[in-house]
Curated annotation (Swiss-Prot):
Native organism: Legionella pneumophila (strain Lens)
Top-rank EC class of the record's enzyme: oxidoreductase
Function: Catalyzes the NADPH-dependent reduction of glutamyl-tRNA(Glu) to glutamate 1-semialdehyde (GSA).
Key words, A-Z: NADP, Oxidoreductase, Porphyrin biosynthesis
Positions annotated as active site in the UniProt record: C50 (nucleophile)
The EC number(s) this enzyme carries: 1.2.1.70
Phylogenetic classification of the source organism: Bacteria, Pseudomonadati, Pseudomonadota, Gammaproteobacteria, Legionellales
Single GO MF annotation: NADP binding
Name used for this protein in its record: Glutamyl-tRNA reductase
C-alpha cells in the first residue's frame, strides 16, 4: 500500500479556487464512487472544509488525482497544478497527522478539523471506499493526533473572543447547565458565544434585540425567550451571564441598573461581557462586588497570550509528530510479518491439537498417563522442530553463516543455554 494525501488548502490556494473544488454534501457519494472508478485508486476518503479539500487514498500513481480533480470540477489541469500538493508514504502520513492535530489549520490548534476528518473517514467506510488498507492508517492517525493534542496542550488556550469568553464564564461558574444567559443584540460574535455556551450545556436563554425578527431567529436556534430592549431592566436579575453587542451610540446598562439586579438576585455573581464598540455597559459597573465585567480589550489580551502559548505548544507538537511518525513506520513495517506470524502460529496450533487428541485417545484406552505424556511431549517437540531443523541443516550445507546467526537470534539459543546452565 502507498498512502497518498493530495489536495489544496488556505495556504496554497485562494478562496476562488478553493470554492470551486469544495465538496458539497450532495456530491459526496458520487465523487467518492467516481474516484474509486479509477483503476489506479484502491481505497479513498475525501475531506472538504472551507479551508481545504484533500484526498487520502491508496494508490501507486498519485498523478491521476490531480487529473481527476480537474476533470470533476471542470478546471484546467494546468491551473489546478499551481495550487495542488501531493504527499506520499511517510510524508503523506506526516501531513495528515499535522492536519488532524490542528497544526495545519488557519487557527493553530483548532479542534474542529479532527472531527471533520473523522466524519469523512466514517462516511467513506459506510460507502465502502475505505477498507482494510486505509482503515488501520486512519485509526492510527486519530489515536496519535489525540495524544499530540493532549501532550502539547495546543488547543488549551483561547485564540478567539468567543472561546475566551466561554473559558472565563467556565472559570466563574463551574456548572454551565444551571446558567441563565441574557443575549442583548444579534451580532456574529455574540451569537457565537451563545452557540458555544449552548454546546457546553446552557439551555436557558433570554434574547433581546432592537430588531425583533433577529431576536426571534436566535431564540429559535437556542430555544430561548424573545424580549425587547425595553424589557432589559425587568429581566436582568434573572441573568447569570449577560452578553451585550448592540450598535447603540451610548451605554444603556449602568451601575444603578446592575446594582438593582444584584439586590434582587441576593448578590449572586453576574458575568457581563460587553462586545460592543462603543460600549453598551458603563465601566464603573465593575466596581460592584460579585460583578465580573469584561470588554473586547480584556478578551484581546487573553487572545494574544493564548496565541503565544499555542505557538509554543505547536513547536512541541511538531516534535511529537516526528516521534509518532517513527512509531507509525515501525508499526507499518511490523504488518509485513503479520501474515507469516499468523500462519506459523496456526500451523503450530494444528500440530499441537493433533498430538493432544492422539494422547487423549491413548489415555481413554487405559494406557499409563505418564507414558502417554512423555510420548506426547517427545512427539510434539519433534514435530515442532522438524521443519526448522531441515532448514538449519540446509543453511549449514550452503555455508550461510549469516542465516545461522539470524536463527540464533530468533531462537535466542544463547539465552536458553544460560538458563540451562543456571538450572544445572
Amino acid at each position: 500500500m502507498v498512502f497518498v494525501a493530495c489536495g489544496l488548502n488556505h495556504k496554497t490556494a485562494p478562496i476562488h479556487v478553493r470554492e470551486k473544488v469544495a465538496l458539497q454534501p450532495a456530491m459526496q457519494d458520487s465523487l467518492l464512487s467516481s474516484l474509486l472508478d479509477l483503476p489506479e485508486v484502491n481505497e479513498a476518503a475525501i475531506l472538504s472544509t472551507c479551508n481545504r479539500t484533500e484526498i487520502y487514498c491508496d494508490t501507486n500513481t498519485p498523478e491521476v488525482l490531480g487529473n481527476w480533480l480537474a476533470h470533476e470540477h471542470q478546471l484546467s489541469e494546468e491551473l489546478l497544478s499551481q495550487f495542488l500538493y501531493i504527499h506520499q508514504g511517510k510524508e503523506g502520513i506526516k501531513h495528515t497527522l499535522r492536519v488532524a492535530s490542528g497544526l495545519d489549520s488557519m487557527m493553530i490548534g483548532e479542534p474542529q478539523i479532527l472531527g471533520q476528518m473523522k466524519q469523512a473517514y466514517q462516511h467513506a467506510c459506510r460507502l465502502g471506499t475505505v477498507k482494510t488498507q486505509l482503515r488501520p492508517v486512519f485509526e492510527y492517525i486519530f489515536r496519535a493526533s489525540k495524544r499530540i493534542r493532549t501532550r502539547s496542550g495546543i488547543g488549551a488556550n483561547p485564540v478567539s473572543i468567543a472561546y475566551a469568553a466561554v473559558q472565563l464564564i467556565g472559570q466563574l461558574f463551574k456548572n454551565y447547565h444551571s446558567l441563565s444567559v441574557f443575549l442583548i443584540g444579534s451580532g456574529e460574535t455574540a451569537s457565537l458565544v451563545a452557540k458555544y455556551l449552548h454546546q457546553h450545556g446552557v439551555h436557558r436563554f433570554l434574547i433581546a434585540s432592537r430588531t425583533l425578527e433577529n431576536a426571534q431567529k436566535l431564540a429559535e436556534t437556542f430555544d430561548g425567550k424573545t424580549l425587547s430592549i425595553g424589557d432589559i431592566p425587568q429581566y436582568l436579575p434573572l441573568a447569570d451571564v449577560v452578553i451585550s453587542a448592540t450598535a447603540c451610540p451610548l451605554p444603556f446598562i449602568n451601575k444603578s441598573l446592575v446594582e438593582h439586579a444584584l439586590e434582587q438576585r441576593n448578590h449572586a455573581p453576574m458575568f457581563l461581557l460587553d462586545l460592543a464598540v462603543p460600549r453598551d455597559i458603563e465601566g464603573n459597573v465593575n466596581e460592584l462586588e460579585q460583578v465580573h465585567l469584561y470588554n473586547v480589550d480584556d478578551l484581546q489580551s487573553m487572545i494574544e497570550k493564548g496565541m503565544d502559548e499555542r505557538r509554543n505548544a505547536a513547536l512541541q507538537a511538531e516534535q511529537l509528530i516526528e516521534s509518532e511518525l517513527d512509531n507509525y513506520i515501525r508499526w507499518h513495517r511490523s504488518l509485513r510479518a503479520k501474515d507469516v506470524i499468523c500462519d506459523y502460529r496456526n500451523q503450530m496450533h494444528t500440530l499441537a491439537q493433533q498430538e493432544l487428541q492422539r494422547a487423549l485417545k491413548k489415555i481413554s484406552a487405559g494406557q499409563n498417563q505418564q507414558d502417554v505424556l512423555n510420548e506426547f511431549s517427545m512427539r510434539l517437540v519433534n514435530k515442532l522442530t522438524h521443519n526448522p531443523t531441515i532448514g538449519l541443516r540446509q543453511m549449514a550445507w550452503d555455508n550461510r553463516e549469516d542465516l545461522l546467526d539470524l536463527a540464533r537470534y530468533l531462537f535466542d539459543t544463547t539465552a536458553n543455554q544460560s538458563l540451562y546452565e543456571e538450572i544445572s
